Curated annotation (Swiss-Prot):
Gene responsible for this protein: rpsE
Name of the molecule in the record: Small ribosomal subunit protein uS5
Species for this entry: Rickettsia canadensis (strain McKiel)
Function, in words: With S4 and S12 plays an important role in translational accuracy.
Subunit-structure text: Part of the 30S ribosomal subunit. Contacts proteins S4 and S8.
SUPFAM superfamilies: dsRNA-binding domain-like, Ribosomal protein S5 domain 2-like
GO BP annotations, alphabetical order: translation
Amino acid sequence: MSKVKKNEETLSEVLVDVNRITKVVKGGRRFAFSACMVVGDKAGRVGAGHGKAKEVNEARGKAKQAAKKRMMKVPLYQNRTIHHDVIGKSGAAKVILRRAKAGTGVIAGGSMRAIFHSLGVHDIVAKSIGSTNVYAMISATFDALNKLASPKSIAMRRDKRVNEISVKSYDV
C-alpha cells in the first residue's frame, strides 16, 4: 500500500524555463538540460526549484521535487492579494510588489506571473527593475514574499492587539 501525501494532486505546476547546456569535452560536445519550475496549491503555498539532467523530462522531475522541498506559506489578504507593498532583491534583480483592488488582475511579467498563478493571487501589480534573468527574478520575488506579514503576525511580534497597530485602509 503506497502512501499518498495530502495536496499532492492539487499542486499546480508551471514550467518557467528550459535551457540546453553544452559541455565541450575532448571528444566533442555533451548536451544536458536545465529546467526551472514553480509549484503551488493556489491557496497561499508556493515553491520554486531548479533541476539539471541529460533529458528534459528528468530535469523537469528534479525541478519539481526541488520546488516541493522549498515550498513556503505566504499570508494573503482575502485570498486574492498581498497585505502590503514590498520590495525584493536578488543580485541585480529588484521587484516591487503592490497590493491591488479586486478585479485588477495579475499585472506582472514572465516568471513573476507564474509564481502568482501558483500562489493563488488574483489581484497584484508587480514591477521588475534591473536584471531580467529568470532565476534572479524568481529569487527576488521569493525574497519579497518572505518579507510579507499579516497584521495579526505583526501585532503578535509587537505584543499588541491588531486594532492597536497602524493598518492601512483595507478597502482595497
